[in-house]
Structure formats: structure tokens, C-alpha cells
Amino acid sequence: MRKTKIVVPIMLTELAELEKVSVSDYRTADIVEWRADFLSADEILEMAPKFFEKFKESKILFTLRTVREGGNIQVSEKKYLQILKEILTYNPAYIDVEFFTHGPSFAALKDFRDKMVLSYHNFDEVPSDLTNRLIKMHEEGTAFVKVAVMPERECDVLDLLQITRDMTLEYGDHFISMAMGDLGRLSRISGYLTGSCWTFASLENSSAPGQISLKETEYILDILEK
């Protein structure tokens, strides 16, 4: 059995697209991520009951990735919180919360920490204070802590792998990390070494640069983790 869980994103751009999605295509995914930021706020709330009904047999991670962290939606703090609160009424397995961008929303949702993937995304670099950021996020006691960063050199990828390993050994196996882009692909399949417990794989369109397909990810992890 693989140790690393595979998360497969769904990125819908209009309400009608949901009907065309085949649930069976996602049957081997451990977790289905609804990347809702390709819709408007109103469309998200309209689609939610249909989405959760369609994927009622799946573990769902709800993600509203904002422009500031590399996503496609720009909303106020109030609207961000409103959407997450509404989504929580459908009892998703997990919700992504952008800790450094939407701290007030995190504070308002602390009762749901057991469902939270507390996240930080940096599409420009691997910040020098990444370890401190990870520790700060870990101290909030959420289910998982996730970071995705952009390497500029090979050593940036190796640094991320080492930081992830150090954090896992010190604080436990609830960290998710990845270096984006082609340069960072190794980080997506090395969880068995670093302790990163989830990886994100694409079915069709990737949700982040450097993402590997579901079929390829399954094949590689089956070799590395058996």
C-alpha cells in the first residue's frame, strides 16, 4: 500500500461542466480537490450542493486559491470566510485555508482545525524563512500544513526536501510540500523519503506547474513505495 496519498484536482469554469465530469475517472484518487477559484463566488455556492452530491463517495478537499497565492479569484476577507463557512455545511473531508493571506478567516474557523489544510503558496521563490513559516503554521494544530514554492535552482529543491524531512522528524507526519515547475518534479514523488504525505496529480489540466499525471504518479509511487 502506498504511503503517499494522491490528490486529484477538478477545475470547473462554468456550472454546466459538472454534468460532464465522470466520477469513475477519479476512482483511484485518494482525495478529490475541488479547485473552486475558477468560478465566481455566486457560482461556487450554486454548484456546491450538486458537487458534493456527485462526489459523495469521495474524500473532498475544498480549495479556493486566491490570486495572491497563484489562484484565480480575488475576494474580500468577508466573502472568503462566507464561502468557506457555507462549504463546511456540506461536511467536506478537508478545506484549504491560506494562513498568511487570510489569517482572520483562519481565526474565525479554528473550531474546524481537524479539517484544515493550512496552506502557503509562493510562485516566485523558496523563501529564506520557509522553516519559520512551517513552524508557525504547525503550531496552529491543523490536520495538515501545506507549502508550495517555486525553485530557481536545483539546490532549492534539495533544500525543500531537507526542510520537509526535518519538520516531519521533529513535529510529525502532517506536512505536505512541493517545489513547482519542471525543476521541482522530484518533490512530488519523494514523500517516502521526506515525509510529505500528499502529492497532487492531474487528470487532464494541471492545477500547478510541474504537476505529473495521475497515471504516471500511480506508476512511479507503486515502484518507489511498495
From Swiss-Prot:
GO terms for molecular function: 3-dehydroquinate dehydratase activity. Pathway: Metabolic intermediate biosynthesis; chorismate biosynthesis; chorismate from D-erythrose 4-phosphate and phosphoenolpyruvate: step 3/7. CDD domains: DHQase_I. It comes from the Bacteria. Its EC number is 4.2.1.10. InterPro entries: Aldolase_TIM, DHquinase_I, Type-I_3-dehydroquinase. It catalyses: 3-dehydroquinate = 3-dehydroshikimate + H2O. It is an enzyme of class 4 (lyase). GO terms for biological process: 3,4-dihydroxybenzoate biosynthetic process; amino acid biosynthetic process; aromatic amino acid family biosynthetic process; chorismate biosynthetic process. Keywords: Amino-acid biosynthesis, Aromatic amino acid biosynthesis, Lyase, Schiff base. 3-dehydroquinate binds at E33, W34, R35, R65, R188, S207, Q211. It holds the Pfam family DHquinase_I. The active site is at H121, K146. Homodimer. PANTHER family: 3-DEHYDROQUINATE DEHYDRATASE. Involved in the third step of the chorismate pathway, which leads to the biosynthesis of aromatic amino acids. Catalyzes the cis-dehydration of 3-dehydroquinate (DHQ) and introduces the first double bond of the aromatic ring to yield 3-dehydroshikimate. Belongs to the type-I 3-dehydroquinase family. This is 3-dehydroquinate dehydratase. The lineage of its organism: Bacteria, Bacillati, Bacillota, Bacilli, Lactobacillales. The gene is aroD.
